[in-house]
Design a protein with these regions (language model features):
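Residue-level marker of alpha-helix boundaries and capping positions
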Residues: 23, 50-51
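DNA-binding patch around the recognition helix
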Residues: 2-26, 60, 64-93
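Short acidic, hydrophobic short linear motifs in intrinsically disordered regions
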Residues: 41-50
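Short amphipathic alpha-helical interface segments
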Residues: 27-41
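Short, basic interhelical loop/turn and adjoining N-cap
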Residues: 53-58
Length: 93
């Protein structure tokens, strides 16, 4: 199974980025929280590619420190380059 984001989810993630611009950690945290709240989950590659969050793990850690109950689910999928890789898929609990 290839790790590809469905078009409807890509569009939703791109809209979140467009509607919530900014490079700051707080802006990235806001986009991640909106993605988790509205879409139910997001993977690290989706956060990097579609939410412009270069260090999603750091942002997740900061959000957890603020009290958000974010759960990580590990999954192994094929990357766009065709290699197997372990990804984190995050959800709100």
């Amino acid at each position: 199974m290839s790790h590809t984001t469905p078009m409807h989810k890509r569009r939703a993630l791109m809209k979140l980025l467009h509607d919530n611009p900014g490079n700051s950690a707080k802006a990235q945290q806001a986009r991640i929280m909106l993605a988790l709240q509205t879409l139910g989950n997001a993977t690290t590659p989706e956060m990097v590619r579609w939410l412009d969050c270069p260090r999603p793990g750091a942002r997740i850690c900061e959000l957890r420190d603020e009290g958000h109950n974010i759960v990580r689910h590990w999954q192994i999928e094929e990357t766009e380059a065709g290699e197997l890789h372990r990804f984190a898929r995050y959800t709100l609990n």
